[in-house]
């Protein structure tokens, strides 16, 4: 049953996609285009308005299970014009008005609030986000790095010294869980603790860190009274965490594993034993970075993919495997929170559409 639920444990190694864009190059354009007058500068609108979506997109959304909440990592990307909103808009405009428009997209039923990772947010900030989303929308919140990073880091990301606040139960409650619960209320979906890569000295003491994590998780207030769909999830960036002992800690605390699709981690199939060990449990997945860029390839992905208006490296095997996991879990009544970064394939809204197509196809092919 569980092999069917989470997909086959064996999967072929995905081919490395081409590094070339899926759009035609200038050399492919008609010769006359070289002599065309440059387009007039486009004026930015003062109001962000939603794209009019076609019937096919609306039908696709209706074919997806209600337990599935697909979305992106943040929403303030001007390059999403024509996909999520109309016209040209600045980052500042989208920061203020973009969420309400984003939440009107038929496929976008969640979003990851990534800025909370860099600095704790206040109750009023969370309340502002909640007020811009419909009642059925759910937020994925990243716990601040002040409690999820074992190191205090410099501006360039290098670790300088041990972080005394790492996994502090008191700070986690006051700086993360309580503000998110109070501000988002029932719209809180997944609260994700992304544990940053550990120095080698700490990896050698992983049993001690597991006990520290256990203490922190057990000290957290229950989410369900305020947020019935709320779930605590732990994401890691070191494969050494993926052990039965880690699964036991999560199970005891009523938390789940965040499936992290990132070049620092093993591929999706290799992480499925963690999901099996915690079953039944909601799915929380963050698709972060295409492996073609390597484990430290964020800057390379940003340079290549910006302004995030098209797909550059479609990862069709990962889409297919993820869709199978989503379909298996939601068919059995569990929620699924899946957020996708622009760094996954180049344009998060298009990847969301691709995953949605795959999920709909899996469900349509399943015996009834």
Positions of predicted regions on the chain:
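Residues lining hydrophobic/aromatic ligand-binding pockets adjacent to catalytic sites
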Residues: 1-368
